[in-house]
């Protein structure tokens, strides 16, 4: 079982709770992160959830690289808009060879056509989308038991 899971959130996800609540709900990113930490702590086996958010692509790439050094065993990533544009994030994930789940709050396939393309999905262990913030809970649970 994985002991260290890294939750990465990309651009604009720091605005959760106030950004387009009709699409993304009213739960803040801080609340999602705390719920995930509590979820890991409840395992009572030393499991740990590390969290990271950045609006900057290069900082996300750097954090993925650091995850390998930190002994992270699984990544849960909502790359936000970078999902549809970032070869750099894809290559960082592949370069570290850390298994990952791609998560999205909304069902990206019910949205604009440009959101239907993901640079991550074909390499992800799983893709979770459209479950609201519960998608994080499900993804973290899977990662902790991987």
UniProtKB/Swiss-Prot annotation:
Active site per database record: 24, 104
Catalysis performed (reactions): 3-dehydroquinate = 3-dehydroshikimate + H2O
Binding residues annotated for substrate, in chain numbering: 78, 84, 91, 105-106, 115
Lyase in keyword set: yes
Pathway membership: Aromatic compound metabolism; 3,4-dihydroxybenzoate biosynthesis; 3,4-dihydroxybenzoate from 3-dehydroquinate: step 1/2
HAMAP family reported for this sequence: AroQ (MF_00169)
Protein name as it appears in the record: Catabolic 3-dehydroquinase
Gene name for this UniProt entry: DQD1
């Amino acid at each position: 079982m994985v002991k260290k899971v890294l939750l990465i959130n990309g651009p604009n996800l720091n605005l959760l709770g106030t950004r387009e609540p009709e699409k993304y709900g009213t739960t803040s990113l801080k609340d999602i992160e705390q719920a995930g930490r509590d979820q890991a702590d409840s395992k009572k086996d030393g499991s740990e959830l590390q969290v990271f958010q950045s609006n900057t692509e290069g900082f996300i790439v750097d954090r993925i690289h650091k995850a390998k050094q930190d002994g992270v065993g699984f990544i849960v990533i909502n790359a936000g808009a970078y999902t549809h544009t970032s070869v750099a994030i894809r290559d960082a994930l592949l370069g570290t060879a850390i298994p990952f789940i791609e998560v999205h709050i909304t069902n990206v396939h019910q949205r604009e056509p440009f959101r239907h393309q993901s640079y991550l999905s074909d390499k992800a262990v799983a893709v979770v989308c459209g479950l609201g913030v519960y998608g994080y809970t499900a993804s973290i649970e899977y990662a902790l038991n991987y």
